[in-house]
């Protein structure tokens, strides 16, 4: 499998933030050139690809936050409130200055070493799902980020996780995460 620039997506150890971020977007960029940008989400977004993977990794109580404005602010407020008594994982998007800001446990963002190591760890799962996809179908960046977040939060033994949905919950991979609560 190749990315948009023709570079192989086969397994290798991810050692830099740039490599990790490139992997998050590789499937999307490959498929984007074969999609109609104006097409409805139902035709070009495929959260079903990560459903089994994300549900399998959803072992901690979660809340998902969706809506058109203020999702990140609400997710951050919920996380801060819960941190008074719990260890809390938080995934938001977009970031301000550093891609790793998207993944936090108790307001501490994932380290560069953990980010690269865990991206290397989940890469085979993602490549396995992507291996037989048609050119116009991709694993969404949100699905890959959710996989990384769940893996990281489990490793850090978080008591509760807060996830900000991306663009539209119905076709958003974050909605595949088993959650006890949803906030709109």
What are these regions (language model features)?
Residues 38, 55-58, 86-178:
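ATP-dependent carboxylate-amine ligase catalytic core
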Residues 181-184:
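Conserved beta-strand/loop subsegment of P-loop NTPase cores
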Residues 69-71, 95-96:
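Short active-site-proximal "capping" loops at secondary-structure junctions
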Residues 1-67, 74-76, 80-84, 91, ...:
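Short functional linear segments
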